Amino acid sequence: MHTRALYPGTFDPITNGHADLIERASQLFSHVIVAIASNPSKKPLFTLEERVEMIKKVTADLPNVEVVGFTGLLADFADEQNATILIRGLRAVSDFEYEFQLANMNRRLNPKLESVFLTPAEENSFISSTLVKEVALHRGAVSGFCHPVVEQALRDRLGKKN
């Protein structure tokens, strides 16, 4: 069975937690689309194009993973991509309530779309893009939290030694 799954997010930047979920999803589904939301209201550190390129490099060894940017409603984009599975990561119980509401809204907007929740590996359970950026901003080491490509991009963008 050919199942197209969509893993959406802002990924500003992609972390080891995201990369772990992408790799595991690529083993569960025949095709995984990493859908990077434009979302200018979040004021991202990296442009959409930069995030797409970073994630393409991080996932280069996963042949069934495609990386694309998108704008608009996720439910509509999933329909355009013929995706029937929406992958979401749950780091803690605190994530569940919001994700539950989001899953119900997406199902209402696109009845063919089923949400599948994956939990991160224990060593990644506390990592978030926001925390990685904060550590990098204060010259902390981020190598344990993100791919070397991302670490270098953070150094280049923030102009500091991490």
From Swiss-Prot:
InterPro entries noted in UniProt: Cyt_trans-like (IPR004821), PPAT (IPR001980), Rossmann-like_a/b/a_fold (IPR014729)
Q: Which GO terms describe its molecular function?
A: ATP binding; pantetheine-phosphate adenylyltransferase activity
Localization of this protein: Cytoplasm
- According to its UniProt record, the EC number is 2.7.7.3
Question: Which CDD domains does this UniProt record tie to the protein?
Answer: PPAT
Known role: Reversibly transfers an adenylyl group from ATP to 4'-phosphopantetheine, yielding dephospho-CoA (dPCoA) and pyrophosphate.
Q: What is this protein called?
A: Phosphopantetheine adenylyltransferase
> Where does this protein come from, organism-wise?
Alteromonas mediterranea (strain DSM 17117 / CIP 110805 / LMG 28347 / Deep ecotype)
